[in-house]
Every structure is written in structure tokens, then in C-alpha cells.
Amino acid sequence: MDRTIVTNATCMSCGCLCDDIDLHTEDGRIVRAERACRLGREWFFGYHGDSQTTALVDGRPASMDEAVEAAASILARADLPLIYGLGNSTCESQRAAIMLAEDIGGVIDTHTSMTHGPSKLGAQLVGKVTCTLGEVRNRADLLIYWGTNPVETHPRHFTRYAYTPRGKFVPGGRYDRTMILVDVQDTLSARAADQFLQIQPGTDFELLTVLRAIVRDQKVDADLLAATGLTLEHATDLVAQMTGARFGVFFFGTGLSRTRGRHMNVAALHSLTMALNAFTKFAAVPMRDLGNDVGADNVMSWLTGYPVGVDFSRGYPRSNPGEFTAVDLLTRREADAALIVAADPWSTMPEAAVEHLETIPHVVIDRAGAGPRANARVQFVTASPGIDAPGTAYRMDWVPVSMRAAFNSRQATDEEVLGRIRHALAAA
């Protein structure tokens, strides 16, 4: 048996983008992923490098050339084609997808619109103060998780970046840090926290507004605070901990950005963060879900000027969340073809959107091991980023990570497939 160890592989199972994973391989298969969490093991053990299938057309195996021609034909005939996904693809592939969207005069949207799209809008409203996870590890002595459950969604966030590691200015690790969780329900993360503040659903904006008023020594609306489920004592104690910290960080999730208030919640959090900087160093970092959601935001912004929901139907980019975002286009039944890249809208989108997606011709580009899509007209089986496909991805703190391939790939990369579709359209 041919056994090898590939060191420092990158895991794209979540926004932590851990790049310290040692892969133990046997005859080209991953048998152990050292230091990987539960989600990471699922990512690596889901790798099927021995897959002989490169493409499917109408559910049957097909050559790459046949599949490319079929995909190009579907997109060329569409009046308003939609390209969606990209959260588990490389920045290079995301760039190719945007160029394809421009070529076909379609709409391109990413997984961000369903998770932290409101976070982008909130930051645009008031600005933001942020930091890297390296700064958190070495400096932060107060961690406030808001509307997120990292124990289950980002299992190594505590141990690798935030709560337990020993840092330059926090040599005692967790003994030099305080971790507070603000959420609407008891979770595994709440049980790990030093302090858990359970608030009423849909009252994040009110609580953030009250906290900022206390920070700025302004009058507090007692009725507003009572609606949150916390007392004035709770709020003043929390503010005292925030202003007394040497370096504090908010980590916020979709429990803040996707609940009542949406982007205004995030704007309120960033406003509170900026107010706290009059007393101490404070920052805010979103807990991003997929491995390269942040990369998709960045590449979309670089090339189009907008992070989500970009429409090229008029020959130039324009964006309007709620109009050109994928869920809305599909729910209104406006898109008449779709290209899904490294995403699973069937398990994440509302039923109405999925129902329409199933009625229109759609092409799927996803890594080996994702499984066949029964109703996909064309499906490409591609290499897995960070496993057998090199490229660049962005961590949740906007730090780029260069990924090398641990194996020689038998499949094409997402970027190569998208490039071939563009070439076929240009030659038609």
C-alpha cells in the first residue's frame, strides 16, 4: 500500500479555513485528517478522487466536450440565465463565473445573499471596525458571540483562533479571556460560555441601541430594554465589561443578520463597536459559513462593484438585493435557466425557489462526492479545492489563503469548466 502524509492542507468546510490539516492517504484515498474537526472530516472524507465520471448529460455519462456544448446551448438560449453559488469554489473560479455571467447577459449571485448579505449592507451604511483572527488570538481578552453557535457551525473557532489558544498578550489562554454569548436560545456554545445572555427573538436591534446609549452616557428607554428580556443591571454590567476590556471582539452570525431588522441589526452592531473604540480597542467579525464566501464577496466587488445579486442583462453591472438575488429571481419565476456552481440550493433555498429551479433547465458544477442531481440537464464532476485543485480562498477575516493541491486531479477544476463553456459560447 502506498501511504503518504500531506501536511498543511486547507479545509474549506467553513469560514475558519484551517490550513494546518495533515492528511494521511492510502492508495490515493484520505484515511485520516489530523487536527480536522467534525465538519472538516466530512469535507475530506467526502473526497472521491477515484471517480471516473467527468460529466453527465440528462443523467447519463458523457464526455467533457459533449457536456460543455450542452451547457453552452442551455445558457445561450435563455433570456435571463442565473449563475448561483460559488461559496465552495476558488477565487479563480469565481472570477471565471462572473466573466461568463457578463458574456451571457445573465444574473450572478452568491451564497452570501442568503446568509450575510445584510451584513454587507449594514457595513455600507455606517462603516466597520474589524481585525484578523491572528489579532484575536494574540490580543483579545473579551469575546462576544452574537447570534451564532460556533461549537456546531465552526468547531475549531474556539480552539484555534479565539477562546482557548495562548497568545502573545493573553499567555493564559482561556484563563485570560472572557467569553459571552448573546442568543435567543440555549445552545452548546452557550454552555461553553462564561456568561450567557438569552434575549427575546427579534430584539437584537433594541438591545444594541440600548447598549450604545449606555456607552455614550445617554438616557435608556426602560420599555425598550424590557422587551429584550434583559434588565438594566444586565446591560450596564455588559457595557462595563466591554469598556473595561483591553481588546474586545464581536463575532456575529446569521442569528443577527437574518432576523428581524436584518441589515439594521448589523449597522447597530458596527455603530456600537465604533462607540466602544472611544474607550478601548473593539472590532467586529462576521462568522461566515462556507469556505470561500468572503472570496466570492471580494471577487464580485472587484469586478462589478457589488458583492451580491449582480445583473448584466443591460450589458453593464447593476445590483439591487431583493430584485437580482437568486431566491427572489427564482421565487418570482423570472430566471429561465440556471448554472449552479459549488452550492446546494436544494437544501438551503425556500421551497418556492427550489420548485421553480426544478422546472427550468439547469447545469450543475460541483466536486466529486457531491452526488448526482436527478433533474440537472448537465452536471460536471470537478476537483475539490484544497484537495486536488489549487487556488485562493479568503478566510472569514478577509485574509487570503493560498491553497495547494494535495493530489493530482483526474477531474477538471471549476475554473477550467467555466472557461470551456465561455469558449464554446464565443465559438458559437
Segments from the language model and where they lie:
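N-terminal, charge-rich interaction modules
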Residues: 7-20, 258, 287-301
